[in-house]
């Protein structure tokens, strides 16, 4: 499917969207898609790499994979919440069981998306998430 023509982010939002996913192919395709829609995107290959970068505090929205070696997506979110970071989070995973969903809800995660996620569903989730923080 061809990528849509270049779009602008909703309401002129320019804060970065951070992708945290250990699968380089997934991260690269998500980044390409989001950049096509005019978003500023930063990718990280692990939760520890993301948490070590001070820019994580200023992210507009976080797309975090749940199942990564070392630190899971929900563990990353736990660390963020302990730091007082309240950036909106979209958790993406190929396996979202009931306990993961419950924990994600307790941590204030706004969207839970199953992999593979359709491009239109992801863009809709990001736009909704960003609109809710204005």
What are these regions (language model features)?
Residues 1-18, 24-31, 120-134:
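Non-catalytic signal-transmission and effector/linker regions of two-component phosphorelay proteins
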Residues 27, 69, 97:
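The feature encodes the CheY-like receiver
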Residues 43-61:
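Acidic, metal-coordinating helix/loop segments flanking the phosphotransfer/catalytic sites
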Residues 45-46, 72-75:
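Acidic catalytic/metal-coordinating carboxylates
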Residues 54-57, 79-86, 107:
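Conserved phosphotransfer cores of two-component systems
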Residues 75, 96-111:
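Alpha4 helix (beta4-alpha4-beta5 surface) of REC/receiver domains from two-component response regulators
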Residues 115:
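A Lys-centered signature of the CheY-like receiver
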